[in-house]
Each structure stands twice: as structure tokens, then as C-alpha cells.
Amino acid sequence: MATIPVNPKPFLNNLTGKTVIVKLKWGMEYKGFLASVDSYMNLQLGNTEEYIDGQLTGNLGEILIRCNNVLYVRGVPEDEELEDADQD
């Protein structure tokens, strides 16, 4: 699957209020509700789970991720969110 370049500010604004996965340069992933994005593209996530090497390591609640640590951000499809809710 090919990736298409997207302007980051509208992309992040469209993801605000939805569940996202943020991967850091260091390999950790955070899955949570994107509460807000500032002008520097720092990310505030709520109800956040931390994953290291694909394994859930803990629930962190509300976190702030500084922009320069982010490798990528992706939205979580709604059907994937529903599957996760069913597992709980």
C-alpha cells in the first residue's frame, strides 16, 4: 500500500476527538483519544494506553507528547475501536 503525503495541520485537526495511535522515534506506541493539537503540533491524548514491542504495558490516562518525538500519527478505524471495546 502506497502512502500519500498529506498536509499535517488539517490532518491532525480532522483526527481531533478520535482515537489515534502515535508512534515515537524510540519505538513506543500510544493509543488514545486525541484531545488537542497546538500550533507546534504537540499532541494531548486522553485515556491513553502505552505499547512497547506490541505489548500493552499500561494505562497512562492523559498525556502530552512533544512534537519532535513523534515518528507518525494514524487514526484508528472505527471497527478496530469496537473490537477493542468488546475485548474489555
Curated annotation (Swiss-Prot):
The keyword Transmembrane helix does not apply. One of its GO terms (biological process) is mRNA splicing, via spliceosome. Gene3D superfamilies: 2.30.30.100. Residues 7-79 form the Sm domain. It comes from the Eukaryota. The keyword Transmembrane does not apply. It is found in: Nucleus. GO terms for molecular function: RNA binding. One of its GO terms (cellular component) is Sm-like protein family complex. Its main location: nucleus. Keywords: mRNA processing, mRNA splicing, Nucleus, Ribonucleoprotein, RNA-binding, Spliceosome. PANTHER family: SMALL NUCLEAR RIBONUCLEOPROTEIN F, SMALL NUCLEAR RIBONUCLEOPROTEIN F SNRNP-F. Belongs to the snRNP Sm proteins family. SmF/LSm6 subfamily. Probable common Sm protein, is found in U1 and U2 snRNPs and may be part of the spliceosome. This is Probable small nuclear ribonucleoprotein F. It comes from Arabidopsis thaliana.
